């Protein structure tokens, strides 16, 4: 039986999974907009530039370097992964502490939206999990095992949606007001789930 080149199969798998996650994300955003409203969704979107900067500082370049090093020397991949995790977390944890501690200042002075202050602590807690997830994905990309990063995306998206639905159900049952913080907790839980999935595989 003819086997396809790993680049082709990997690309097809990532494309299919990416498309599936986009569809899930599309319906998830519709649900969020109806649950927390347009204003809440806007506040949720406003915190992502800060999240993107934190990711770029603690994970982005490290993920790329790890992928290249692992591809060049697969037998040293595990050692590269351990070093990358240590380096990434050594940056991610102080960033988490800074964002958590100075949430009010960052919301008012950087994001120019004081209403975002309650969202930043939960966002900050997701950063170490993002770092772990990124490093693990870089490692598996280097080994040309794209199935793990692909399915970690599915795990993240599904757990995020399920957790948000569960929180909404609990809030409705107990008559607790639903706020935009719901979406950020969903993000945190999804990132944690994908990080744990990658570490356990």
Name each model feature, range by range.
Residues 8, 45, 76-90:
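Interfacial transmembrane-helix starts/ends
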Residues 152-166, 174-201:
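Hydrophobic alpha-helical transmembrane segments
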Residues 32-52, 115-117, 179-184:
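Interfacial/gating helices of multi-pass transporter permease domains
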Residues 97, 112-136, 162:
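Alpha-helical transmembrane segments of multi-pass membrane proteins
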Residues 45-69, 125-128:
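Small-residue-rich midsections of specific transmembrane alpha-helices
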Residues 130-152:
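Membrane-interface junctions at transmembrane-helix termini in multi-pass inner-membrane proteins
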Residues 94-117, 171-172:
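Short membrane-interface helical motifs at transmembrane helix boundaries
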Residues 1-24:
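N-terminal membrane topogenesis motif
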């Amino acid at each position: 039986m003819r086997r396809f080149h790993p680049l082709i199969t990997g690309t097809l798998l990532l494309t299919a999974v990416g498309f599936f996650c986009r569809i899930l994300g599309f319906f998830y955003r519709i649900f969020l907009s109806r649950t927390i409203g347009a204003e809440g969704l806007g506040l949720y979107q406003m915190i992502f530039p800060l999240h993107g900067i934190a990711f770029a500082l603690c994970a982005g370049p490290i993920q790329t370097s790890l992928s290249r090093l692992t591809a060049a020397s697969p037998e040293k991949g595990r050692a590269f992964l351990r070093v990358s995790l240590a380096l990434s977390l050594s940056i991610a944890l102080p960033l988490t502490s800074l964002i958590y501690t100075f949430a009010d200042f960052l919301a008012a002075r950087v994001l120019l939206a004081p209403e975002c202050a309650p969202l930043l602590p939960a966002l900050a807690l997701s950063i170490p999990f993002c770092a772990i997830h990124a490093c693990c994905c870089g490692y598996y990309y280097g080994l040309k095992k794209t199935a793990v990063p692909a399915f970690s995306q599915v795990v993240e998206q599904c757990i995020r949606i399920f957790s948000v639905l569960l929180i909404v159900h609990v809030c409705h049952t107990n008559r607790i007001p639903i706020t935009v913080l719901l979406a950020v907790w969903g993000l945190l839980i999804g990132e944690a789930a994908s990080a744990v999935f990658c570490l356990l595989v």
